[in-house]
From Swiss-Prot:
The gene is rrp41. This is Exosome complex component Rrp41. It comes from the Archaea. One of its GO terms (cellular component) is cytoplasmic exosome (RNase complex). Belongs to the RNase PH family. Rrp41 subfamily. It comes from Saccharolobus solfataricus (strain ATCC 35092 / DSM 1617 / JCM 11322 / P2) (Sulfolobus solfataricus). Keywords: Cytoplasm, Exonuclease, Exosome, Hydrolase, Nuclease. CDD domains: RNase_PH_archRRP41. Catalytic component of the exosome, which is a complex involved in RNA degradation. Has 3'->5' exoribonuclease activity. Can also synthesize heteromeric RNA-tails. Binds RNA. It is found in: Cytoplasm. GO terms for molecular function: 3'-5'-RNA exonuclease activity; RNA binding. One of its GO terms (biological process) is gene expression. Gene3D superfamilies: GHMP Kinase, N-terminal domain.
Amino acid sequence: MREMLQVERPKLILDDGKRTDGRKPDELRSIKIELGVLKNADGSAIFEMGNTKAIAAVYGPKEMHPRHLSLPDRAVLRVRYHMTPFSTDERKNPAPSRREIELSKVIREALESAVLVELFPRTAIDVFTEILQADAGSRLVSLMAASLALADAGIPMRDLIAGVAVGKADGVIILDLNETEDMWGEADMPIAMMPSLNQVTLFQLNGSMTPDEFRQAFDLAVKGINIIYNLEREALKSKYVEFKEEGV
């Protein structure tokens, strides 16, 4: 009976060297970015990476309530990461899970390294991220949506944040894992950076790699991050050009 219940591990790298979704090992999923999608937010963005889709909204800087929680030398950055009940195959409980609370903290810490919070003492900046559809990489997609929403709000930043997960599947180092690879691969390593500063803002590793595999994976992540970073900058430039043409 136990043998009947066992699920056979899928082959992740096919005989032609490609992955189950048709990509090469060093290939990103398709990326789509939209800015200013919510008129009632100070800044907002949608970031899509393959089948993973996140929306972020920013409010602030604004007066901190309650006031006794404000800081005299910097803004307080408050971040909420949340997965909508319809974002996965199985409807999830709308109440915040332990994972969502933990990832809210991870994303906040990554954003704090980028936002010039010292320019806005005794204020609060609220960042809300919602996963609309999940297919691996949700923490990074949320982080990038939040980074772009902050830029859309005109909040000064040291740099935009770009990130991607690298991993190992069937012994091959791969870029930008999908859900099947995330579930069945031997390793998963999400990395986010401020590329112009060459500074890592988020780093996690699940699974194991040899030192050589780690170096190969990190180099591949940097390559992917630079591609994503250029797409982020182009999205911001396009919005400014659009505003200028409209006379805003």
